A protein has these predicted regions:
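Short loop/turn motifs that connect adjacent beta-strands in outer-membrane beta-barrel proteins
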Residues: 4-11, 38, 73-83, 131-137, ...
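Membrane-spanning beta-strands of outer-membrane beta-barrel proteins
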Residues: 12, 24, 61, 118-120, ...
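Gram-negative (and chloroplast) outer-membrane scaffold detector with strong preference
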Residues: 33-135
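Extracytoplasmic loops and strand-loop junctions of Gram-negative outer membrane beta-barrel proteins
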Residues: 11-14, 104-111, 159-165
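Outer-membrane beta-barrel "beta-signal"
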Residues: 65-70, 170-197
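Structural signature of outer-membrane beta-barrel domains
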Residues: 48-50, 91-97, 144-150, 183-187
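Transmembrane beta-strand segments that form the barrel wall of outer-membrane beta-barrel proteins
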Residues: 9-24, 40-53
Length: 197
C-alpha cells in the first residue's frame, strides 16, 4: 500500500524584479519573506554601470531598499503574499547620469557608498495580483522624504568639470514598482491559477 506523502511545512518566499527598472536598463533583483501574522520583509538591489567615455554617456545607478509590509484584505487571508499591502520603505542609492552634456551625480565624487548616497524614507501601498500558479504581478507606489547631495558637472576636454553642488530635500512620490514575482516555497502557489489545495 502506497503511503501518502507527509505534508510539508508551509514556507512563503518570493523572488522578484521591478520591470520598470528593467525597461530603464537598470538590472534589479529582490526577495521577500513572510514572517507570519500578515507581516513580511522585502529587500531589493539594483545596479547599472553603463558608460561610453568618448560620447560623454553615463547611465550609472545602484542602490538598495528594504520594506516591512503588512498584508490585508480577503486575498491576504486566503494565502500570504497576495492582495493589498501597506508598509514602510527605506532606500539608499547613488547615480551618475550624463547624456552628452550636463551630468548629474548623486553624493560626493570619489566617496564611499555612505558618502555618495542619497536616502529615502517613505510609506508605501501596493497590491499583488496572481497571474499564474507561481507568478504574481505586484503594483506598488511609495511617497516620503528624499535627502542628499547632487553634483552638476560639464564635460570639458574629456574631463568632468564641477559646476554646482545642490542639496536635495524633497517630499513626494519616491517609488513606482510593477514587479514580476516568482513564488517559492511549500504551499506558496495560487489556487485559482493551476494550483490545488
Amino acid at each position: 500500500v502506497a503511503q501518502a506523502a507527509a505534508p510539508c511545512r508551509p514556507f512563503y518566499m518570493a523572488i522578484k524584479t521591478n520591470m520598470l527598472y528593467d525597461l530603464a536598463a537598470v538590472p534589479n533583483l529582490g526577495a521577500e519573506f513572510y514572517l507570519g501574522k500578515n507581516f513580511s520583509i522585502a529587500a531589493n538591489y539594483m545596479h547599472a554601470w553603463w558608460k561610453n567615455d568618448a560620447k560623454n554617456f553615463y547611465w550609472r545607478y545602484y542602490g538598495a531598499d528594504a520594506s516591512i509590509r503588512w498584508w490585508f484584505g480577503k486575498p491576504a487571508r486566503i494565502k500570504p503574499l497576495q492582495g493589498h499591502h501597506i508598509g514602510v520603505n527605506y532606500q539608499i542609492l547613488t547615480c551618475d547620469f550624463q547624456l552628452g552634456k550636463t551630468g548629474l551625480m548623486a553624493g560626493m565624487p570619489n566617496g564611499n557608498m555612505v558618502d555618495r548616497a542619497n536616502h529615502i524614507v517613505a510609506l508605501e501601498y501596493g497590491y499583488s495580483l496572481p497571474i499564474a500558479k507561481r507568478l504574481n504581478l505586484d503594483f506598488t507606489i511609495a511617497g516620503g522624504y528624499h535627502w542628499g547631495l547632487f553634483e552638476e558637472y560639464e564635460p570639458v576636454d574629456g574631463h568632468p568639470v564641477w559646476q554646482a553642488t545642490k542639496r536635495r530635500q524633497y517630499f513626494g512620490p519616491t517609488k513606482v514598482e510593477i514587479s514580476l514575482v516568482w513564488l517559492i516555497g511549500c504551499d506558496n502557489y495560487n489556487k485559482d491559477k493551476g494550483g490545488k489545495r
